A protein has these predicted regions:
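Active-site-flanking segments in enzyme catalytic domains
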Residues: 4-16, 30-34, 42-106, 115-257
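Surface-exposed receptor/substrate recognition regions of extracellular proteins
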Residues: 1
Length: 257
């Protein structure tokens, strides 16, 4: 059976056919996994950051799904992949980031913070599909004193009234990768962040853990847009003084020298 990796929508349909044939061919999932594993990808690289597009982005998505999905078997993991795509993925004409924009964003954050020189290896995949509930997504895996991360940038699901652009979504996701790097965990933030919020007079007592993770990512975004508005400003209601504090905080935890 040929597998179509051109985008996540066709992959969803391909996996649907695979499900129908499973009773006839119990090796079908293994054949799919082998087809994914044997492909050689050709990313655009900027230091430790690799950027994937087209079918390479789809294959990178699948590989990360297998790597980060707890499963007792290959079949269960493939089944979970299909269910996720069936439930969340749709074809869309929403706005999408492109390679030149990603490269430009990375140039800006490198100029500000030497970002790519300081962080772990990160793959960035441009996904030609809409993910329900998400404009982008970040994940990482951790080893002994090591980290490897991935960002998936979908077609825009919601720009929140024109506030967000694909570039600011990328900046937000880079903020998540920063906290992965600093803490070595997906859901733990550096203690310095809570002290920073107290200095600003912010009350986080009723904020959920998930809210705090998003707030940290937005703090990185605010730090960048304090220095440049060319990507837009999703938070015009936040003063430049607060944005300057965000910039100083990020600069301190990720020094330029």
């Amino acid at each position: 059976m040929r597998f179509d990796f051109s985008n996540l929508c066709t992959l969803r349909d391909t996996l649907g056919q695979l499900m129908e044939r499973y009773e006839e061919n119990e090796n079908a999932f293994r054949q799919f996994y082998d087809a994914v594993a044997e492909k050689t990808l050709c990313p655009h690289s900027i230091g430790p950051i690799r950027i994937y597009n087209g079918s390479d982005a789809v294959l990178e998505y699948i590989r990360w799904f297998y790597a980060t999905t707890p499963s007792v078997s290959l079949d269960d993991c493939t089944d979970a992949l299909y269910l996720r795509l069936e439930d969340k993925i749709s074809c869309s004409y929403g706005e999408q980031i492109d390679l030149p924009t990603i490269c430009h964003v990375l140039t800006i954050v490198d100029d500000l913070f030497s970002f790519s020189q300081k962080l772990h290896p990160i793959s960035i995949s441009i996904i030609d599909a809409e993910m329900d509930g998400r404009n982008g997504e970040s994940i990482a895996v951790f080893g002994d004193d090591s980290c490897s991360g991935a960002i998936f940038l979908y077609r825009m699901w919601n720009d929140f009234g024109g506030r967000f652009t694909p570039a600011t979504v990328l900046l937000h996701e880079l903020g998540h990768q920063l906290h992965f790097h600093l803490t070595g965990a997906l859901r733990r933030l550096p203690e310095s962040f809570y002290a920073f919020l107290r200095q600003l007079g912010a009350d986080d007592t009723n904020a959920s853990d998930a809210d705090m993770l998003e707030l940290f990512a937005d703090t990185f975004l605010l730090a960048v847009i304090h220095k440049t508005k060319e990507f837009g400003d999703p938070f015009p209601e936040i003063s430049e003084k607060i944005k300057e504090h965000c910039y100083s905080y990020i600069r301190n935890i990720l020094p330029t020298e």
